[in-house]
C-alpha cells in the first residue's frame, strides 16, 4: 500500500457518488445572522425529488462536486458548505418549488460582487438534473454589506450637490441614440437643458464610435452644460458614458470628465462588468462625480420567469458595487415592469431597512445598515400624460427620463423639455395640495396645459399613445 493510499484511508475517504441530500439538505438548520441567504426557483428534471434538487443547488454553488473527493477530509465541510434548509411549493406550478439556501460568510471575498455571483449564479445554473433555475432573492447580512463602499454618494448628497429638493429629477436620453456628430449632439443636450431638464443622457450604446468619438462628445456636452447653467441659474448635468472596452480606457474617460468639471458620468454595469463598475464607483466617490448606471443586458438575465436571476437581485448587487442612479422600469411605459414588484426592488434600492413582503417579491428582510441609497430611474416610452402616475408611483426620490417624450415634441427639444417640467411642477403642486394623482391625473395635466402652449402641444401629440401589454414578471 502506497503512502498516498494510506493518507486517503486515514481520513476516512470512501470513493464514489452519493446523493447530494445526504450532505447538503439540512431542514433543521437555523440560519445565522451572518449567513448569506438565497431563494431559488427550481424546476428539476422529472424524477428528481425536491430535496435532492435543492441540495444539488446548495452543493454546486458552494463546496460540492459530483463525486466524493479525498480532499474533503482536509477541511471542515460542515463549516463551509451551503445548506438547503427549506423547500416550499410554488402556487399554481406543479413542477417548481422555492429552495432556500444558506451560505457561510467565509465563502465570499469581502467587497466583491464578482466573487459572490461567481459562486451563487455560476456553474450551478448548468446542472443537467435541473430543467431551469432562477435566483429570486438574496439576503445580504450587515457583516458582508459593510465590506462594500456602495454608491459613490447616495440620494441626500446628490440633492445637496445639485441643490434640488422636493421633486423628482427630470432627465432625457438624446435621440437618435446613434449617428449624430458630436457638435449636433451637444446642441441637442443644450436645448433640452435650457428648457428645464436637470439631466440629459448618453444612450447605453453610445461609447466611442466612428461618427462620434468620446472625447469630442465630452467636450461639446460640457460646453452645453455650462451654457445652459449660465442661462437658467440651475445646476445641470449630462450622463457621459464612460463604458469602454477595457477598464483602463474607462478610467481614462472618467478622469477626463472630472477635468472638464462635469457633475456625473455613466456606466453600463452589466455589459461592463461588476469589477469595472466597482472600480469606477470608487473613483467617483474619491473625485466628487455622481455615477449613473444603465442596466443594458438585464432582460437577457431576468426576463424569463423560471430561469436566470430576478432584477431585484441585480439591483441589490448594484447597490453594493456602486451607483447613484439605476434604471428600474416605469410600470406605465414601454418596458416590462409590474407595479408591486417594481416598487419592491425600488425600496431595496432606496431604503435603509426593508421588511420581507412576498406580495412584492421581497423574500428576505434586508438591513443595509446605512449603505447609501440609489435613485431609481424611470425611462422608456413615457410622456407628459404619464407624469401624474410616475410622480405617484416613484415619489420624489427618483429620476424621470423622457427621451422620445422630449425630443419628439413637435416644436423641438427645448419646448419638449418645457412641457415635461411644467407637467412635473403641476403634479408636485397638486400632490402637495392633497389632490389624488391617480384619480385626477389627466385633469391636472389638462389644467396645466391651459397656461403652457408647450405642454398643450405635447398633450395633443401623445394623447392616444399607450403600451398595454400584460407583464411577464408576476409573482
Swiss-Prot record:
Its chief place of residence is plastid
Is-annotated flag, keyword Acetylation? Answer: yes
User: Which positions does the site annotation Transition state stabilizer cover?
Assistant: 334
Q: Name one GO molecular function term.
A: magnesium ion binding
Q: Which InterPro entries does the record associate with it?
A: RuBisCO (IPR033966), RuBisCo_large_chain_AS (IPR020878), RuBisCO_lsu_C (IPR000685), RuBisCO_lsu_C_sf (IPR036376), RuBisCO_lsu_fd_N (IPR017443), RuBisCO_lsu_N_sf (IPR036422), RuBisCO_lsuI (IPR020888)
Statement: the UniProt record of this protein carries the keyword Plastid = yes
Query: Which metal ions or organic cofactors does this protein require, according to UniProt?
Result: Mg(2+)
**PTM annotation (N6-carboxylysine): residues:** 201
This entry's Enzyme Commission designation comes to: 4.1.1.39
Q: Name one GO cellular component term.
A: chloroplast
GO terms (BP aspect):
photorespiration; reductive pentose-phosphate cycle
How does it get modified post-translation?
The disulfide bond which can form in the large chain dimeric partners within the hexadecamer appears to be associated with oxidative stress and protein turnover.
Q: Where does Mg(2+) bind?
A: 201, 203-204
Localisation per UniProt entry: Plastid, Chloroplast
Residues binding substrate, per UniProt? 123, 173, 177, 295, 327, 379
Active site annotation, chain numbering: 175 (proton acceptor), 294 (proton acceptor)
Catalyses which reaction?
2 (2R)-3-phosphoglycerate + 2 H(+) = D-ribulose 1,5-bisphosphate + CO2 + H2O; D-ribulose 1,5-bisphosphate + O2 = 2-phosphoglycolate + (2R)-3-phosphoglycerate + 2 H(+)
Functional description taken from the UniProt entry = RuBisCO catalyzes two reactions: the carboxylation of D-ribulose 1,5-bisphosphate, the primary event in carbon dioxide fixation, as well as the oxidative fragmentation of the pentose substrate in the photorespiration process. Both reactions occur simultaneously and in competition at the same active site.
Q: Which family does it belong to?
A: Belongs to the RuBisCO large chain family. Type I subfamily.
The note filed under miscellaneous reads:
The basic functional RuBisCO is composed of a large chain homodimer in a 'head-to-tail' conformation. In form I RuBisCO this homodimer is arranged in a barrel-like tetramer with the small subunits forming a tetrameric 'cap' on each end of the 'barrel'.
Instruction: Give the protein's recorded name.
Output: Ribulose bisphosphate carboxylase large chain
Species for this entry = Viscum album
Amino acid at each position: 500500500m502506497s503512502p498516498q493510499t494510506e493518507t486517503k484511508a486515514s481520513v476516512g475517504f470512501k470513493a464514489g457518488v452519493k446523493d447530494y441530500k445526504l450532505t447538503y439538505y439540512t431542514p433543521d438548520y437555523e440560519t445565522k445572522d451572518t449567513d448569506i441567504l438565497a431563494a431559488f426557483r427550481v424546476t428539476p428534471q422529472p424524477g428528481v425529488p425536491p430535496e435532492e434538487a435543492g441540495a444539488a443547488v446548495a452543493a454546486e454553488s458552494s463546496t460540492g462536486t459530483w463525486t466524493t473527493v479525498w480532499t474533503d477530509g482536509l477541511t471542515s465541510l460542515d463549516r463551509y458548505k451551503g445548506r438547503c434548509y427549506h423547500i416550499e411549493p410554488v402556487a399554481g406550478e406543479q413542477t417548481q418549488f422555492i429552495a432556500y439556501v444558506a451560505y457561510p460568510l467565509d465563502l465570499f471575498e469581502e467587497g466583491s460582487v464578482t466573487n459572490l455571483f461567481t459562486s451563487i449564479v455560476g456553474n450551478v445554473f448548468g446542472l443537467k438534473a435541473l430543467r431551469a433555475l432562477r435566483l429570486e432573492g438574496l439576503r445580504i447580512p450587515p457583516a458582508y454589506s459593510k465590506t462594500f463602499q456602495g454608491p459613490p454618494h447616495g440620494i441626500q448628497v446628490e440633492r445637496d450637490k445639485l441643490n434640488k429638493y422636493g421633486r423628482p429629477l427630470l432627465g432625457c436620453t438624446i435621440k437618435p441614440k446613434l449617428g449624430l456628430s458630436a457638435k449636433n449632439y451637444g446642441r441637442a443636450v443644450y436645448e433640452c437643458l435650457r428648457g428645464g431638464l436637470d439631466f440629459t443622457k448618453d444612450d447605453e450604446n453610445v461609447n466611442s464610435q466612428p461618427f462620434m468619438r468620446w472625447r469630442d462628445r465630452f467636450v461639446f456636452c460640457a460646453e452645453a452644460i455650462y451654457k445652459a447653467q449660465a442661462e437658467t441659474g440651475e445646476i445641470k448635468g449630462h450622463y457621459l458614458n464612460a463604458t469602454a472596452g477595457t477598464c483602463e480606457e474607462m478610467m481614462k474617460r472618467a478622469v477626463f470628465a472630472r477635468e472638464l468639471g462635469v457633475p456625473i458620468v455613466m456606466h453600463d454595469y452589466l455589459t461592463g462588468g461588476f469589477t469595472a463598475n466597482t472600480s469606477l464607483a470608487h473613483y467617483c466617490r474619491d473625485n466628487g462625480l455622481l455615477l449613473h448606471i444603465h442596466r443594458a443586458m438585464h432582460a437577457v438575465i431576468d426576463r424569463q420567469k423560471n430561469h436566470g436571476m430576478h432584477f431585484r437581485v441585480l439591483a441589490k448587487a448594484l447597490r453594493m458595487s456602486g451607483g447613484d442612479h439605476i434604471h428600474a422600469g416605469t410600470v406605465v411605459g414601454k418596458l416590462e415592469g409590474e407595479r408591486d414588484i417594481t416598487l419592491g426592488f425600488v425600496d431595496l434600492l432606496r431604503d435603509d431597512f426593508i421588511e420581507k413582503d412576498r406580495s412584492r417579491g421581497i423574500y428576505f428582510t434586508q438591513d443595509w445598515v446605512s449603505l447609501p441609497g440609489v435613485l431609481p430611474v424611470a425611462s422608456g416610452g413615457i410622456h407628459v400624460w404619464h407624469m401624474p402616475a410616475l410622480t405617484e408611483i416613484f415619489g420624489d426620490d427618483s429620476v424621470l427620463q423622457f427621451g422620445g417624450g422630449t425630443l419628439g415634441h413637435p416644436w423641438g427639444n427645448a419646448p419638449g423639455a418645457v412641457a415635461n417640467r411644467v407637467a412635473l411642477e403641476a403634479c408636485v403642486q397638486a400632490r402637495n395640495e392633497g389632490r389624488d394623482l391617480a384619480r385626477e391625473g389627466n385633469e391636472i395635466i389638462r389644467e396645466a396645459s391651459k397656461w403652457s402652449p408647450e405642454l398643450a402641444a405635447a398633450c395633443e401629440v401623445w394623447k392616444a399613445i399607450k403600451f398595454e401589454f400584460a407583464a411577464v414578471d408576476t409573482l
